[in-house]
């Protein structure tokens, strides 16, 4: 963005290689993860596990991310960013191998938590790497492009699963290949100079609290985005099955949500940079996208009897939810660098993950027991609270 500090080490040799390696490694790793996630849910349903229990398994991924994220800046401070990224790529591969070699649900639960820990580390570091490597004046563009690519992985993973078939013996091998390729590309990330604030940045729980207090509305936007983009996406296969869709169509709901994220993230990031006041522009766009979520979610009251409504609804959830996260990350990238950037990114990921954890943890039971009342009520409440808070903040800023 135009307000990005020019002192950032983006002109250092290897910054282009850094951007490329982070983009490509994340593309392959997340494609594997988002192919694996619906595959696990469908395997659980095939084993006649209840929808409520399957939803709790989906929530365990977010629980792992939620537990690890507060400590991401501490781990990074101790190990360094490259070593931590390498660790975060190895752990999901080990977890995937475990899923395919055992049928013990207790082991699966432990592996899901471990993979969640790794996802939390990589998530924070990948976002911070993009902001660190981006050329001055183009941070919004690159963060938007990265978010678009992440949305693309939502499409690639489930689409591969639907194409190969959830019951195919080839599906596990494709997952392993994707994760292994992502691990190999992570090794290409170049070294960075030492962080200028290694000894002064607030890290850990103290740093997280400071970031939340300083920018509460940005973090609330992250929560709403996480609820509708990632949290609900994790239970969309269950939602589709409950609505009477087939297994492949239910898995494709995740692709539709991801397609929405893919199409909107980059334009939202570029548009945010065009306002005379970028900060006010970001808040305006956040308010508009949250209002769109609220409008689309009203369709959940009728989707049980008009199942075609689920397709545009989940597309808007993915598009607007992803845009909220992208705009919040651009806001952080405009203000922070070094370990402070890692820490503030961790806070955004934490609130985003909390939104995902709430959505996946509660929605499974609500879909199973109160599809037409409880699930819509929860979703509408979250959207309404987010919109009210953003409207209040925007009006205060306009005065």
Model-inferred region functions:
Residues 113-148:
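Cytoplasmic helix-loop-helix junction between adjacent transmembrane helices
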Residues 121-134, 322-336:
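Intracellular juxtamembrane helix-capping segments at the cytosolic ends
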Residues 12-62, 215-222, 229-243, 250:
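Helix-loop boundary and gating motifs at the non-cytosolic
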Residues 68-80, 165, 264-280, 367-368:
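Helix-to-loop junctions at the C-terminal end of transmembrane segments
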Residues 280-325:
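C-terminal transmembrane helical hairpin of 12-TM major facilitator-type secondary transporters
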Residues 339-368:
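A late C-terminal transmembrane helix in Major Facilitator Superfamily
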Residues 83-97, 283-298, 380:
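Structural signature of the two symmetry-related core transmembrane helices
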Residues 172-188, 376-391:
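Symmetry-related core transmembrane helices of the 12-TM Major Facilitator Superfamily/SLC fold
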């Amino acid at each position: 963005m135009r307000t990005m500090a020019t002192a950032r080490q983006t002109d250092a040799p290897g910054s282009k290689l850094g951007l490329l390696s982070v983009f490509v490694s994340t593309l392959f790793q997340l494609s594997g993860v988002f192919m694996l996630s619906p595959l696990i849910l469908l395997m659980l349903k095939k084993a006649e596990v209840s929808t409520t229990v399957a939803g709790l398994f989906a929530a365990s991924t977010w629980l792992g991310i939620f537990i690890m994220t507060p400590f991401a800046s501490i781990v990074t401070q101790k190990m360094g960013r490259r070593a931590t990224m390498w660790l975060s790529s190895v752990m999901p591969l080990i977890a995937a191998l475990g899923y395919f070699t055992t049928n013990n649900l207790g082991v699966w639960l432990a592996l899901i938590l471990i993979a969640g820990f790794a996802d939390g580390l990589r998530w924070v570091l990948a976002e911070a790497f993009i902001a660190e490597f981006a050329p001055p004046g183009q941070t919004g563009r690159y963060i938007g492009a990265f978010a678009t690519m992440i949305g693309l992985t939502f499409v690639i993973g489930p689409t591969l699963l639907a194409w190969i078939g959830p019951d195919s013996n080839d599906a596990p091998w494709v997952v392993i290949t994707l994760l292994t390729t992502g691990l190999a590309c992570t090794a290409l990330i170049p070294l960075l100079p030492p962080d200028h604030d290694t000894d002064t940045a607030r890290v850990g729980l103290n740093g997280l609290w400071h970031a939340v207090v300083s920018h509460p509305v940005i973090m609330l936007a992250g929560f709403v985005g996480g609820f509708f983009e990632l949290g609900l996406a994790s239970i969309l296969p269950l939602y589709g099955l409950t609505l009477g869709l087939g297994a492949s169509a239910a898995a494709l709901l995740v692709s539709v949500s991801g397609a929405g994220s893919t199409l909107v993230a980059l334009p939202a990031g570029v548009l945010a940079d065009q306002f005379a006041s970028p900060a006010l522009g970001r808040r305006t766009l956040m308010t508009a996208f949250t209002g769109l979520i609220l409008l689309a979610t009203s369709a959940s009251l009728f989707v049980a009897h008009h199942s075609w409504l689920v397709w545009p609804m989940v597309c808007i959830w993915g598009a607007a939810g992803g845009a909220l996260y992208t705009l919040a990350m651009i806001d952080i990238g405009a203000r922070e660098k070094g370990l402070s950037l890692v820490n503030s990114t961790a806070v955004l990921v934490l609130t985003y993950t909390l939104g995902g954890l709430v959505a996946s943890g509660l929605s499974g039971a609500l879909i199973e027991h109160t599809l037409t009342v409880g699930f819509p009520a929860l979703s509408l409440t979250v959207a309404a609270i987010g919109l009210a808070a953003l409207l209040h903040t925007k009006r205060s800023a306009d005065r």
